Every structure is written in C-alpha cells, then in structure tokens.
Swiss-Prot record:
Membrane-spanning segments: 261-281, 294-314, 326-346, 444-464
GO CC annotation terms, alphabetical: axon; chloride channel complex; GABA-ergic synapse; intracellular vesicle; postsynaptic membrane
Quaternary assembly: Three rho subunits (rho-1/GBRR1, rho-2/GBRR2 and rho-3/GBRR3) coassemble either to form functional homopentamers or heteropentamers. Rho-2 is unable to form a functional homopentamer. Interacts with SQSTM1.
Protein's UniProt name: Gamma-aminobutyric acid receptor subunit rho-2
Principal cellular location given in the protein's record: membrane
Catalyzed reactions: chloride(in) = chloride(out)
Length: 465
C-alpha cells in the first residue's frame, strides 16, 4: 500500500508539471509570432558579412601579388585617361606657371580583381583599397606643386566591375610650369600644357592613351579669368624619350589664353599717353616762365618713370624687349625731348637777350632829347640796326656810297603824330612783342611733337594688335 501511494504521488506531480508548462510555451510562441518582421521591413542580404566558418571575401586581394602590373611579362597594359577641368585658378607671369583643379580618371582591366556577379553590377570603394592593389603611376611632368583634396575625406574613388575593369578617379589641384613668351605683352597670347606620364613603366609595359580622343577632355563652361580669355582646350599625345630609361607615353592638355587688353589700356597706355600730351603744354607757356615749364617737365618725366617701374615690377625679368617696353620708352623719350626743347629755347633766348643788351649799350645818351624828332648815331652801327630802331623799310636806306658818316634816325616818339598813326604803331608793337616772346622752336614743336607721336601710335597698334 505505501508503494502505491508513492507511485500515485509521483504521477500527480508529473501531471501538474506538464500542465504548468503548456501556457508558458504558448505565451513564448505568441511572442515569437508577433515579432516576425513584415515584408515591408525585410532587409536585403548583407553580402559583406563574414559568416563564421565560411569566409567569402569580395575581392581576393590577398591571393595575388599586386606589386606587379596586370599581365606581367605580356604585352603593354592599355590605360585610358580622361580629364574634367573644374577650374583654372590662376596664371602667374612672374613665376611662369598656372594652377588648375581637375578630375583625373584612369581606365584599365585587371583580371585579378574579377568577381562573380549575377547582376553584373560594379562595386565602388574609397581610397583605402588603392593601397592594396595595383594602380597606374601617372604623374604630372613639370609640376611644381600638386595635391589630392582630402575634405571631408580623400577625394579618391575606385570602381571595380565583375569582368575586372577598373575606374580610378581622383580630384587634384596642380601647379605646373608654362613657358611664356612676352615679346608681344600685353597684346600676347599664351599656350600652356599640362603633361601626364607614367613614372616607372615605359611604353613596353604601359600604354597611356586618351580614352575618347578629343572628347576625353571636358571643361566647365563657367571657367573664366580676370586677365585672360580662354580660347581653346585640346588634347595631344606623343612619346617622350629619356636616355637612361627609354620611351614613355606622354599625354598633353593644351589650352590657349589671350590677354584682356582693356585692363592695360587703363593702367598703362592711357596714363602714358596723358603724360606725353601734358608735356606738350609747356610749348604754350611763355619761355620766360622758367619755374612753370621746368616743374612741368620734371613732373612728367618722374611720372613716366613711375609707370615704367610699376609695369616691370609685375613682370618677370626677361632679356628681350616687350611691346609695352617699346610704347613706354618711346613715350618717355617724347616727354624727355620736351624738357630738352625748353632747354634749347631758354639757351637761345639768353643769347638773344645778350645781343640786345650789347646793342642797347652802344646807343648814345638821350638825356634831354625826349621831344626831339631826330638823333645822331655813330657810323659804327650797321644799316639794319639803324633801320630797326627807326622803323623804316629797307628801301629808304641810302646807298653805301651816298651814306654820310653819321646816320640820322627819326624817332617814332613824336608828339605830332596823328592819332590814327599812333594806333597803327601800337598794333605793330603788340604783334612784334608777341612774335619776340613766342620762340620759333616752340611754334614748330606744337606741330612736330603731336604729329610724330600720332604716327608712332599708328605704326605700333598696326604691328602688335
């Protein structure tokens, strides 16, 4: 009997335990059913996730030696290039260089990077993968400075296609040398080139070419420069030879620039022309106004020197004559000649005054003879001198054999002259005064200087423009 009771008790406990577990299982099952994701929130399979025990890398980078070029030992690998110019930042005449920002893209095929894909879609990577695979070693020939942009991260993109084709793109700013010819400056045009070349691989290992010919170079239509007009962008290619290493493929990005002349017309040509014209003002100033004419000449000479110095400060020191040098120095010569012209006028005027002073010193004293109608002159005076004093024409002078020892000069200061004759004498004296104070050199200079300067400008602009 005790044995039966124990057995019944055990069975009862088991039944109670089974009944107690049934609601809990149902409750957990209900929770699992409510936590099932809807098809709207169903996520795609993450192919980058490494499953435990079954590693499946996307690119078998570790299985190959990427220090070697693709198809090493075989024919040269073709690498296509295209460029999109984002901006032409600056042109420096002093340093003879230019700065350009561009997108540089390379295209090649590396079978070691091929991967199976049912959708035939490419995979895009950032710059971290570039350090693990082979990429072309293209560099800029004659570059002074260059860098890859790194804001907010390195501006490098690598795109790999299932068949192994690779697109490698980066955003670069480069400062390169440009051989400029300033013989026609500022009426010049400059042609600059950005040159690309493989650093290590000759044409036997790497064939560098423009991927789409002339269409491989794209430019932004908004590119503009303050002093230049961009006329043309075009591409070329050729082989470059180095005596130590051999032949290399070299690609050229050529662009032609034409300088805007309006800036230099305002800053250089127009001020120089004004200074030359200002120097002509001295020809209309009385030659006895020494301070006015001297100060005007010095001012124009110093201003021309300042203009020439300012132009040379913004240009490289070249060993040949530029077009602007010809214009400025010819203008400087015109200004300097105007100063020399006044020096000649002043010198000749001084000589004339000395002769007149000596002539007046030979005249006898006229004290007490102011109302006299005539006066006696010594016979040592020439007939022209006596004639000029008396105011008679040459026809009234006696022949030499009939001339007495003393010459009688009738003075014009006679109180008995009629009023009409006095007015005529005053007009004649006024004309004689103007003629004597307007030197002949000044009169000719007023015409000669402008005429020669106009002829020079016609020749200059017809040759250089």
């Amino acid at each position: 009997m005790p044995y039966l009771m124990r057995l019944a008790l055990v069975l009862f406990c088991l039944m109670a335990l089974v009944e107690s577990r049934k609601p809990r299982r149902k409750r957990w099952t209900g929770l699992l059913e409510t936590s099932k994701p809807s098809h709207l929130y169903k996520k795609n399979l993450d192919v980058t996730k490494m499953r435990p025990g079954k590693p499946r890398p996307l690119l078998r980078v570790e299985d190959h030696d990427f220090t070697m070029r693709p198809a090493f030992g075989g024919p040269a690998i073709p690498v296509g290039v295209d460029v999109q110019v984002e901006s032409l930042d600056s042109i420096s005449e002093v340093d003879m260089d230019f700065t350009m920002t561009l997108y540089l893209r390379h295209y090649w095929r590396d079978e070691r990077l091929a991967f199976p894909s049912s959708s035939n879609k490419s995979m895009t990577f950032d710059g971290r993968l570039v350090k693990k695979i082979w990429v072309p070693d293209v560099f800029f020939v004659h570059s002074k400075r260059s860098f890859i942009h790194d804001t907010t991260t390195d501006n490098i993109m690598l795109r790999v296609f299932p068949d192994g084709h690779v697109l490698y793109s980066m955003r670069i700013t480069v400062t390169a040398m440009c051989n400029m010819d300033f013989s026609h400056f500022p009426l010049d045009s400059q042609t600059c080139s950005l040159e690309l070349e493989s650093y290590a691989y000759t044409d036997e290992d790497l064939m560098l070419y423009w991927k789409n010919g002339d269409e491989s170079l794209k430019t932004d239509e908004k590119i503009s420069l303050s002093q230049f007009l961009i006329q043309k962008f075009h591409t070329t290619s050729r082989l470059a030879f180095y005596s130590s290493t051999g032949w290399y493929n070299r690609l050229y990005i050529n662009f032609t620039l034409r300088r805007h002349i309006f800036f230099f017309l305002l800053q250089t040509y127009f001020p120089a022309t004004l200074m030359v014209m200002l120097s002509w003002v001295s020809f209309w100033i009385d030659h006895r106004a020494v301070p006015a004419r001297v100060s005007l000449g010095i001012m124009t000479v110093l201003t021309m020197s300042t203009i020439i110095t300012g132009v040379n400060a913004s240009m490289p020191r070249v060993s040949y004559i530029r077009a602007v040098d010809i214009y400025l120095w010819v203008s400087f010569v015109f200004v300097f000649l105007s100063v020399l012209e006044y020096a000649a006028v002043n010198y000749l005027t001084t000589l004339q005054e000395q002769k007149e002073r000596k002539f007046r010193e030979k005249l006898p004293c006229m004290c007490g003879m102011l109302h006299s109608r005539t006066m006696m002159l010594d016979g040592s005076y020439s007939e022209s001198e006596a004639n000029s004093l008396a105011g008679y024409p040459r026809s009234h002078i006696l022949p030499e054999e009939e001339r007495p020892d003393n010459i009688v000069v009738h003075l014009a200061l006679n109180s008995e002259l009629t009023s009409s004759r006095k007015k005529g004498l005053l007009k004649g004296q006024m004309g004689l005064y103007i003629f004597q104070n307007t030197h002949a050199i000044d009169k000719y200079s007023r015409l000669i200087f402008p005429a020669f300067y106009i002829v020079f400008n016609l020749i200059y602009w017809s040759v250089f423009s």
